[in-house]
Swiss-Prot record:
Protein name, per record: Large ribosomal subunit protein uL1
Organism per entry: Ectopseudomonas mendocina (strain ymp)
Family: Belongs to the universal ribosomal protein uL1 family.
Biological classification of the source: Bacteria, Pseudomonadati, Pseudomonadota, Gammaproteobacteria, Pseudomonadales
Gene that this sequence comes from: rplA
Alphabetized NCBIfam families for the sequence: rplA_bact (TIGR01169)
One GO BP: translation
Subunit structure and binding partners: Part of the 50S ribosomal subunit.
Gene Ontology annotations for the cellular component aspect, listed alphabetically: cytosolic large ribosomal subunit
UniProt entry keywords in alphabetical sequence: Repressor, Ribonucleoprotein, Ribosomal protein, RNA-binding, rRNA-binding, Translation regulation, tRNA-binding
HAMAP family found in the cross-reference section: Ribosomal_uL1_B
GO MF terms held by the record: rRNA binding; structural constituent of ribosome; tRNA binding
CDD domains reported in the protein's UniProt record: Ribosomal_L1 (cd00403)
Pfam families: Ribosomal_L1
Length: 231
């Protein structure tokens, strides 16, 4: 049997397996256990009572976290004319059409979010094999294909997260950084849960939000007592 590392021993000594922690307890303990040389993210996993094999039970959308994610977000926008000026004014890092598509085909993909106006989809449609595998393909269901590109840019820069149930019916997303106040993290998670509940499929039966787990990038996952969340 492999020996536990010093970090693993510290986690084993302080984490009670199977316990449901209040949100504040979990955030505090995870921050205490963070002992790496970079600032870890706080991540949340939400197990939903859906059957992801059924297309009408796939939950996807986007949430603007009230306190952001703590990350600097690079945004590229496919649009032209007045939309291009509005996108740049809103803080877009790069705006273009065929020129931007050519750069991306050549390997310049240093962006976290790609947004497009509807009239630009004729250009973006050529980039499916480039953007799709990276999760960057604009999609109207998460607000990244929109005539109001300026608002989409502002939302992305403000800390909007996009989500979709995986094959097990679980939503995974980042909700902040170690160093965030617990209250700010909690507001972010509550905003996410509120949107998930709003998007509940009509065909979903039984308990919808089955489990909420909070973790850090390199840390353990702690089950959250949902009674400690206002959502």
């Amino acid at each position: 049997m492999a020996k536990l590392t010093k970090r693993q021993k510290a986690i084993a000594a302080k984490v009670e397996a199977g316990k449901a922690y209040t949100f504040e307890e979990a955030a505090s303990l995870l921050a205490e256990l963070s002992a790496v040389k970079f600032t870890e993210s706080f991540d949340v996993a939400v197990n939903l009572g859906v059957d992801p094999r059924k297309s009408d039970q796939v939950v996807r959308g986007a949430t603007v976290l009230p306190n952001g994610t703590g990350k600097t977000v690079r945004v590229a926008v496919f649009t032209q004319g007045p939309g291009a000026e509005a996108a740049l004014a809103a803080g877009a890092d790069k705006v273009g059409m065929d020129d931007l598509a050519a750069e991306m085909k050549a390997g310049d993909l240093n962006y976290d979010v790609v947004i497009a106006s509807p009239d630009a989809m004729r250009v973006v449609g050529q980039l499916g094999q480039v953007l799709g595998p990276r999760g960057l393909m604009p999609n109207p269901k998460v607000g990244t294909v929109t005539p109001d590109v300026a608002t989409a840019v502002k939302n992305a820069k403000a800390g909007q997260v996009r989500f979709r149930t995986d094959k097990n019916g679980i939503i995974h997303t980042s909700v902040g950084k170690v160093g965030f106040e617990a209250a700010a993290l909690k507001q972010n998670v509550e905003a996410l849960l509120a949107d998930l509940k709003r998007l509940k499929p009509s065909t979903s039966k039984g308990i919808y939000v089955k489990r909420v787990t909070l973790s850090t990038t390199m840390g353990p996952g702690l089950i959250i007592d949902q009674a400690s969340l206002d959502a």
